[in-house]
């Protein structure tokens, strides 16, 4: 549904990559529309995220720590939340930063949202801006949490 879309996948299992390529060809998708990227250093892995437009979270097992990396790099992510903890991790992260509109609860809405985002560069840019600004705030959050905890502990000790 998105003519110029390219899917970017991790290539770290030769047999899985072979099977994926077979399935891609079987479904009539040109192989040049799929990029298989090898594992790389963490800095390069994070730099690659600047080249993507949107991250498609997996289901039923969400991205977990990868989702955190994606959001910290300013890459918008679409997720499909389910009923289990592992299917709600990415949704929880998106909710915590005020991006509930990127959380879907069925396959049709997930696909439609991805297609809509692919056609709306301004909306994607707005999400990137929100994520980058929010990252600056999240960087300060641990120190604020520690100060709050210190205050609470001091008050508890003084109350003894």
Please name every model-derived segment.
Residues 4-8, 35, 53-54, 76-77, ...:
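Beta-sheet entry/capping signal
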Residues 23-29:
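Short helix-loop-beta junction
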Residues 50-60:
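Acidic donor-binding loop of glycosyltransferase active sites
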Residues 1-4, 10-23, 35, 40, ...:
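C-terminal amphipathic helix plus adjacent low-complexity
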Residues 41-52, 72:
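Short acidic alpha-helix that forms the nucleotide-activated donor recognition element
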Residues 31, 58-139:
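Catalytic binding pocket for nucleotide-activated donors in carbohydrate/polymer assembly enzymes
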Residues 12, 39-41, 61, 82-83:
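An acidic- and aromatic-residue-enriched active-site/binding cleft used to recognize and process polar
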């Amino acid at each position: 549904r998105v003519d110029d879309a390219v899917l970017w996948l991790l290539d770290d299992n030769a047999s899985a990559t072979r099977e994926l390529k077979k399935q891609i060809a079987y479904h009539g998708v040109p192989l040049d529309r799929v990029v298989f990227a090898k594992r790389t250093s963490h800095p390069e892995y994070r730099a690659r995220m600047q080249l993507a437009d949107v991250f498609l979270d997996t289901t039923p097992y969400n991205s977990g720590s990868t989702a955190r990396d994606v959001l910290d790099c300013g890459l918008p992510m679409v997720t499909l939340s389910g009923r289990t903890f592992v299917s709600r991790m990415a949704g929880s992260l998106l909710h915590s930063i005020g991006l509930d509109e990127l959380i879907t609860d069925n396959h049709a809405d997930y696909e439609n949202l991805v297609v809509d985002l692919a056609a709306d560069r301004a909306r994607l840019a707005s999400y990137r801006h929100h994520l980058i600004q929010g990252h600056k705030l999240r960087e300060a959050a641990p120190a604020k949490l520690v100060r709050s905890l210190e205050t609470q502990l001091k008050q508890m000790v003084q109350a003894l």
